[in-house]
From Swiss-Prot:
One example GO MF annotation: squalene synthase [NAD(P)H] activity
UniProt KW keywords: Transferase
PROSITE patterns: SQUALEN_PHYTOEN_SYN_2
GO cellular component: endoplasmic reticulum membrane
SUPFAM superfamilies: Terpenoid synthases (SSF48576)
Catalytic activity from the UniProt record: 2 (2E,6E)-farnesyl diphosphate + NADPH + H(+) = squalene + 2 diphosphate + NADP(+); 2 (2E,6E)-farnesyl diphosphate + NADH + H(+) = squalene + 2 diphosphate + NAD(+)
UniProt xrefs under NCBIfam families: squal_synth
Listed pathway(s): Terpene metabolism; lanosterol biosynthesis; lanosterol from farnesyl diphosphate: step 1/3
Name of this chain's protein: Squalene synthase
Free-text function comment from the UniProt entry: Squalene synthase; part of the third module of ergosterol biosynthesis pathway that includes the late steps of the pathway. The third module or late pathway involves the ergosterol synthesis itself through consecutive reactions that mainly occur in the endoplasmic reticulum (ER) membrane. Firstly, the squalene synthase SQS catalyzes the condensation of 2 farnesyl pyrophosphate moieties to form squalene, which is the precursor of all steroids.
Originating organism: Ganoderma lucidum (Ling zhi medicinal fungus)
PANTHER family: FARNESYL-DIPHOSPHATE FARNESYLTRANSFERASE, SQUALENE SYNTHASE
Length: 467
């Protein structure tokens, strides 16, 4: 941010200005891949690897910063892994390539990626990562330098992903269907494009010895991590994707008749463009709420996965995108502006999340706080209200089970201490105390009745006439 932007931020959002200053002053990168001491693991001294790092910056500047802080040679491995998947995704997304051209490339990409000298310059000029494929020789050269254990994982994940992408691309081209039908199809698509990324990364952690070997077998948890990120991006990027006629929201959700009936209509939406048409705002928000509920279903599995990580750099690499996803979900929820503009969390909020996402407890509480914000904005007339409440409650329950919070206390005049009445749990504690007091009172009464009975019996015995 320039000086003018910072001055404007100081005047309009002073708290955010303070957060950014704190981030600038105190958050130091864990490593600098350009330093000579890092060259053996980062490969910065080689022109080919340096170009790969440049491509990473161009494709995802925010993500590249997180990758570069991963310790050892894992940063270089993840960089190449990301570029391979980005190259694959670029071909799959290119609407200018006919299906007969796209299919053989997609289905052979895992072999082409490591083939010396292979490049591809037939992507449309508007594809932002086109140059990556044009200069693919730098990627293939570095891939072939990797240890076999890492390279085999990259090739295996690419082969699985390309199969799913090719199948979906062929279906769209041959059936003229532009929509994903069911939630199951939606989950499968997200598994191919994101869940497999989580699987590959986790296998890297295990293969490197930096995490437990059995972690690589936790496929359900790794899939949840990927699906949570992908589904959040799909919600946020709705309008951008719609303008390019890419529709990832499943018809099973956006076409539900319940959402139409909730606003007095007979049916749900029939076409996705109806979501951003004037007069459909309320029904569109109900659809969006259903999409958010679907994402929140992956939250506790993601928290379970993060609890298994032991290396700080790996934990931060995995945790920061997840907390960003929760922040993005909260920003999108009940925000109709999302259907017309590309929205994103503010820079200061992102900086705060980066600084706070350092351990499982704090990350869990970040999840909980954003879940509370969404639940506070939920409306009872929303057909998904109950399911949303349950999803948010499960996050609360997970946090209390693994990282119990403390009931807040408040000092009153005279030096006394009482439970803070603004803490919702105060009522639970007060009810428990009242129950304990009532049980104690009943016990005392029972003891008094017993003593009284004994005295009465003793008195009657003493007054009885002797025989």
């Amino acid at each position: 941010m320039g000086a003018t932007s910072m001055l404007t931020l100081l005047l309009t959002h002073p708290f955010e200005f303070r957060v950014l200053i704190q981030y600038k002053l105190w958050h130091e990168p864990k490593r600098d891949i350009t330093q000579v001491s890092e060259h053996p693991t980062s490969g910065w001294d080689r022109p080919t690897m340096r170009r790969c790092w440049e491509f990473l910056d161009q494709t995802s500047r925010s993500f590249s910063g997180v990758i570069k802080e991963v310790e050892g040679d894992l940063a270089r491995v993840i960089c190449l892994f990301y570029l391979v998947l980005r190259g694959l995704d670029t071909i799959e997304d290119d609407m200018t390539l006919p299906d007969e051209k796209k299919q053989p490339i997609l289905r052979q990409f895992h072999k082409l990626a490591v083939k010396p000298g292979w490049t591809f310059d037939e992507c449309g000029p508007k594809e932002k990562d086109r140059q990556l494929l044009v200069e693919w020789t730098v990627v293939s050269e570095e891939l072939n330098r990797l240890d076999a254990c890492y390279r085999d994982i990259i090739i295996d994940i690419a082969e699985k992903m390309q199969t799913g992408m090719a199948d979906y691309a062929h279906k769209a081209a041959t059936t003229n269907s532009i929509y994903i039908g069911t939630v199951d199809e939606y989950n499968l698509y997200c598994h191919y494009v994101a869940g497999l990324v989580g699987e590959g990364l986790t296998r890297f952690w295990a293969a490197s010895g930096k995490e437990a070997e059995w972690l690589g077998d936790q496929l359900e948890l790794t899939n949840a991590m990927g699906l949570m990120l992908q589904k959040t991006n799909i919600i946020r990027d709705f309008r951008e994707d719609a303008e390019e006629r890419r529709f990832f929201w499943p018809r099973e959700i956006w076409g539900r008749d319940a959402y139409g009936k909730a606003v007095g209509r007979a049916n749900g939406f029939r076409e996705m463009h109806e979501l951003y048409e004037r007069g459909n705002e309320k029904q569109a928000l109900w659809v969006q709420s259903g999409m958010v509920v679907d994402v929140l279903g992956h939250a506790t599995d993601s928290l379970d996965y993060l609890r298994l990580l032991t290396k700080q750099s790996i934990f931060c690499f995995c945790a920061i995108p997840q907390t960003m996803a929760m922040a993005t979900l909260s920003l999108c929820f009940m925000n109709y502006d999302m259907f017309h503009n590309h929205i994103k969390i503010r820079r200061a909020e992102a900086a705060s999340l980066i600084m706070r996402s350092t351990n499982p407890r704090d990350v869990a509480y970040i999840f909980r706080d954003y879940a509370r914000k969404m639940h506070a904005r939920a409306l009872p007339e929303d057909p998904s209200f109950l399911r949303l409440s349950v999803a948010c409650g499960k996050i609360e329950q997970w946090c209390e089970r693994h990282y119990p919070s403390f009931v807040r206390l408040q000092q009153v005049s005279g030096g006394g201490i009482v439970f803070d009445p603004s803490d919702a749990r105060t009522k639970v504690v007060e009810a428990a105390q009242a129950r304990d007091n009532e049980l104690a009172r009943e016990k005392r009464l029972a003891e008094l009745r017993d003593k009284t009975g004994k005295l009465e019996r003793k008195l009657r015995w003493s007054q009885a006439p002797s025989s």
